[in-house]
Amino acid sequence: MFNSLMNFWKGKDFLSQVIDDFSAMLDHSENIFTMVSRALLENDKPENLKDTVYEVDKTINRLERSIRLRIVEHLTLQPTVDTSMCLCLMSVVKDAERIGDYTKNLFEVIELLEKPIDRATFDTYFNGMNDNILKLFKDTKKAFIQEDDAKAKATYQLESRVVKECDAILINLAASDLSTNEGVCYALIARYFKRIAAHLVNISTSVVLPISQLDYFDEKMAVGYDAPK
């Protein structure tokens, strides 16, 4: 399906702009995730971080609306175009928008914390998960923008690991002696990490999945779904 989509894009000026805008959405999301993670885990918090996070989130939302409008206008003017291609685009831009929302939620955890995170304690539970999510950002963009099937399939495996680790974190937190504040904040971080990873993989797997299966990757993983060969 995705090869047809890329052929469809060729020579289409408006879709070239759509891809540029979508790439910008992913870049903005990765940038604020990096800033928020640094503030959360290293207590490296610029004074204007809150304003930056909220402004970038608004930018991501504007890009999503712009992309959707272009697609609708194109379908109106050229109704014979293969609509499944446009449905794919509509789906992945929503995933990109949700990543921005969850990153904003992650920032809000910083405001809930009574004291800065103890990195050693955090690593006991999360074991470098933030680095794995940053890798997912990069691999997702490469998979989608560069039509990299191998990279898309690799994200299946990494996201599966992140999901299982997030579920295990919640079990461990429930049995821990952390303070209520720490326990709740760590649980929220695990939840947001899991959702960010899931939306990233929804995007990357649009390269290898048919349109009818988009957005159901995390449910398939829960029942032992295997990535396409």
Residue ranges and their predicted role:
Residues 1-229:
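Cytosolic, long alpha-helical scaffolding segments
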